[in-house]
Amino acid sequence: EAADTSSEFSKYDFSEPMHDLNETVSNSIFSILKRSGLFRTFARAVNESYQEGSLDRNLVDKVANSTWQKTINAADDAYKPGIFTTFAGYEYTSSVDLYDRYLHRNVIFKDTKNLPDRIFSRLDSQDPEELWNWMDIRREEGVESLAIPHNSNISGGAAFSMSDYNGGPIDETYVSKRLRNEPLVEITQAKGTSETHPFLSKNDEWANFEAITNHPGEKILSNLKGSYVRDAYLRGLTLAEQGLSNPYKFGIIGSSDTHVGGGSYTCLLYTSDAAD
């Protein structure tokens, strides 16, 4: 919508850098990085405009709902039973600033039957517990889904905290809600591994393997604790030893996060190949 200069959304000043962005599309790593940078600035401006009241929420919902329906249709169109499995899903992002409660979750639905017309976004709440509440309500309506935290390595310690999003204690309600909605966590991807960090695993000679270590945010220990899977498992076991429930009993997945809709094993043109 922002790229389409004929749309109402494109008339806002924050949309101008996005105008005609799709007229020329390249799959080079440099193009992907450029588009990513533009989108980050755009997303921040959209959120600020909404918070200030200068952006009409009805217009945002109209654009979001249209995009969501296209996503569902794309999943249905590409689904080939027994050959190629697709899911409708979207990314829920709580923050746009690295290491400042930078929380991302991929919300994936079991199938496309009776999906909601409108998805839950950061404009509804930046608190992941509110996302889980929304997922629970949808589940009661027969719509099953799961959320997968990803890129936890740059969450600033918020991904696997010893308190809830608002700083309160982790109680039984929080634990059951999290375990029910987030049975998986992404452990590695193109933007660095989330398994562990050299500062957290000093006796592991492989702790720096594909870890982000050169960003200033990685020099602050408080940004690391609560951001990595090994540390999360340890924190969960510590809570269990104290007689408390463990919110960090989860399986793991690996991803590309190259945003090109495919794996590097299928085509030489994907950015993951270019990065290699």
Predicted feature descriptions by range:
Residues 1-272:
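Extended, charged catalytic domains and RNA/DNA-binding interfaces, predominantly
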